[in-house]
Amino acid sequence: MENLHTFLARYPPFDGIEPDTLRALVQDAEQHSYEAGDQVLVEDGLPAPGLWVVLAGSMDLLHEGEVIQVLEPGECFGHPSMLTGMAPAYTVRAREPSACALLSEAAGRRVLSTEAGVAYVARTMRRRLVRTGQT
């Protein structure tokens, strides 16, 4: 796979970050592989330790056992839990063999504090609330 910072630079909210800054933010990111059915985050479980990004494959975002979104490469998850320190409101489960990157909490907060990051959080939260009928 290409360098993580090059991959991320194609997707919001990373696409608005200067290349050198993005490279520094992701230098300590961990890459994880998952088999179909593996859970990464558990609804009402431990808070997210950072910002997750799907690199390959796809992940199901579930609320109360129902799939409300399929996360594809370039999409983030765990940000509401990471930002609040609260338990995740959703379970995230590998739909197929998948790979994800985990950015540290500090790096995730820095990414999401940009104008593009704030817009990304608002957009994803609105979409998820609509899909769960909580608007």
Indicate residue ranges for each PLM-predicted region.
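A short hydrophobic beta-strand segment most commonly corresponding to one strand
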Residues: 97-108
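Short acidic-glycine-tyrosine-enriched beta hairpin
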Residues: 66-80
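Helix-loop-beta junctions that constitute the ligand-sensing/allosteric loops
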Residues: 30, 50, 85-91, 97-99
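Short loop/turn positions at the edges of beta-strands in beta-sheet-rich folds
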Residues: 55, 65, 84-86, 94
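A small-molecule sensor/coupling module
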Residues: 4, 20-22, 82, 87-89, ...
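Regulatory nucleotide-sensing modules
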Residues: 5, 9-64, 71
